[in-house]
């Protein structure tokens, strides 16, 4: 018989390749990351588990550091939760860490901010291995112009021009802490840190910055588009394949682990593995 005790709350850090998933959130008849994680943890707990995530990523979007919490009466060592869940998860989803947290902790509401990275590969021929993990760009990109243009988005603004038409948020006001555009060889990465995001906000920003990088618009166009508060003035929504939930920030006192993927990222790309901390 499984050992049980008082209800406690656990947090886990999850990495996943979102290519074949219809997003994080559980949806009837669709393959989702939440469904896979809940089934795996329920097997370890020996009772149904419901997980709540820091961010609900869309179909095809990846995560290096998704954070989720769940409640359980099952008594298991942390290592048992991590390894046990991974034994029930598909190869494109992995739990890297687990920790017990206070019952007041909430993966989404306790978070102070989130960072996303949007990755573009600029080369003349389409990629094969990276086809579902980057946005392929045939033409050269002016990275400096993209970075210059992006600075107009820093601070608190109405991001109506960069929200999806179907976005259900009651307000378009969001605060962007930092946004950078960096390039190393064929790889270009947009990194944005904000308190919260609108539906498709990062991908719409990426699509607009790509127009600046390609020379189709001047850097000042981004500021003009932001001020217009009109979705039709911005660029197209960039493909989901290039987007990664990179980091979720919590109060330091909680000692939530950083992304397990940060060091391999630096080795593979030559770009910094860790984000600038705006706190």
Report each predicted region and the residues it spans.
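Structured-RNA-binding interfaces characteristic of tRNA pseudouridine synthases
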Residues: 1-279
